[in-house]
Amino acid sequence: MLFRQVINEDLGCASYLVGDIASGQAAVVDPQWDIAPYLEAARGRGMRITHILETHTHADHVSGRGRLHEATGATMHVSPLADAQFPHEPLDDGAVIDLGTVRLEAMHLPGHRPEHTGLLLIDTSRGAEPWAVLTGDSLFVGDIGRPDLAVDAADGAREQFSSIQRLMELPDWVEVYPGHIGGSLCGSAEISAKTSSTIGYERAHSALTRSDDVRAFTAELISRLAVKPPDLDRVVGMNNGPLVTPGAPAPALDGEEFLRRAQAGGVVIDGRSSAAFAAAHVPGSLSVPSAGSGFATRAALVAGRDDPLLLVGSDEAQARDMGERLAAVGRRDIIGVLAGGFSAYLDEGL
């Protein structure tokens, strides 16, 4: 059996490559914008990605579903409750996808969104019981997924209560693999950076998983809510819509043209360190250091929703990386990167 967890540290997202080595079949669950890790892992094992599954319509990042489908021709699956406007097979509660001896069984877990669906993982060569569950945005390590991104927060929280109760009926040994880790806006400050847990551990060490009072559960979950992901409606629309593929690379601009576009309304995001920015920067630019996690979310929060973006890095490669990370949160309005990086700008004497 092949089981690979793929983490996007910038967004705190987790996705999964699951497959049967003997049959050569594999599935990707919640593919991220960068699909290279799945293709490389499958190729390294001589496997084919035959299925793509979405636990729900994501609101914080753009799915790599379209890119992965284009690269592999894999069948796409999503709940019939999603407003999916692309060819797919319905992922109903109890639906089964067999990949040789590896079985994925859908488990409807509404609350984060009405269509939200977890996946039980079963190794039929060893037994009929699940050894793990991919919980998506229902149960995280140390936290519960937020309920307010698709419906009224109280309504979503009550649905989430029922879904968590259902998950807690699973045996203690079942491993929990969530859709997010610490740093994601789909959880709260309680979400752990740990990448997995078990049903037994979460039951024993989380007040919300033990709660049998829906009103108390709802009040606590709502009290944890933080700022919503930036550009939520646009990202949801992109993920529900036709296949999203990469746009044309942003042009590299010399300093003079870069300044001209900034003066014409472009918002300049400078990804260098705070110290480097303090020493010198393009006039009017915003400092959003790209080192570490959370860059794309922070940059999208400070930039205007409809403002075109211009990117500055220590070198051009850093600016290109910033652009890729911003594309993952739906920003396809990058109109230029500073050619040669900030040192080249200084050399121009502008």
Task: Label each residue range with its predicted role.
Residues 28-29, 48-58, 77-81, 108-111, ...:
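Active-site neighborhood of phospho(di)ester-bond hydrolases with catalytic His/Asp-centered motifs
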Residues 126-127, 132, 142, 154-247:
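Divalent-metal (often Zn2+) His-rich catalytic cores of metallo-beta-lactamase-fold enzymes
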Residues 3-6, 16-17, 96-128, 251-257:
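Core dinuclear metal-dependent hydrolase active-site scaffold
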Residues 18, 30, 56, 68, ...:
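Divalent metal-coordination and catalytic microenvironments
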Residues 146, 200-248, 266-267, 274-350:
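Rhodanese-like catalytic fold shared by cysteine-dependent sulfurtransferases
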Residues 1-48, 119-136, 142:
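Conserved beta-strand hairpin/beta-sheet module of binuclear metal-dependent hydrolase folds
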Residues 33-77:
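Active-site metal-binding motif and surrounding structural segment of the metallo-beta-lactamase
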Residues 34-36, 57-62, 83-86, 114-115, ...:
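Active-site environment of divalent metal-dependent phosphoester hydrolases
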